[in-house]
Amino acid sequence: MSKKKSPQRYKMHVKTGDTIQVISGRDKGKVGEVLKTIPTTSEVVVKGVNVKTKHVKPQQEGESGQIATFEAPIHSSNVMLYSTKEQVASRISYTFTEEGRKVRMLKKTGEIIDS
């Protein structure tokens, strides 16, 4: 008997709600907010980045077709966390607060992301 394997989940450096900057690809330099993370494929959906169009057929008679736009996922290795205060992208490090909580900190600015 074979065991059913659960899909591999990758540890990602970004979380939903983070402000990031795209560092490679067609949308290089764009800054946006992470709307969704997909840990199984290590991808993120970012607001205003990698926008695709989809032509939707009419579902009912008399209804007209539409052209829908949506944000497609991009790989998490193509994004860096972005400091809105300093206007700079940075890698992250993990540090502990005085209370003993583990938080993410931007290496360039020292700004703590997790509040």
UniProtKB/Swiss-Prot annotation:
Q: What's the protein here called?
A: Large ribosomal subunit protein uL24
Spans traversing the lipid bilayer: none
The answer to whether keyword Ribosomal protein applies is yes
Query: Which Pfam families does the entry link to?
Result: KOW (PF00467), ribosomal_L24 (PF17136)
- UniProt organism field: Crocosphaera subtropica (strain ATCC 51142 / BH68) (Cyanothece sp. (strain ATCC 51142))
> So which domain of life are we looking at?
Bacteria
Task: Please name the PANTHER family in this protein's record.
Answer: MITOCHONDRIAL RIBOSOMAL PROTEIN L24 (PTHR12903)
Note the CDD domains from the entry: KOW_RPL26
Q: What is the lineage of its organism?
A: Bacteria, Bacillati, Cyanobacteriota, Cyanophyceae, Oscillatoriophycideae
Q: What does this protein do?
A: One of two assembly initiator proteins, it binds directly to the 5'-end of the 23S rRNA, where it nucleates assembly of the 50S subunit.
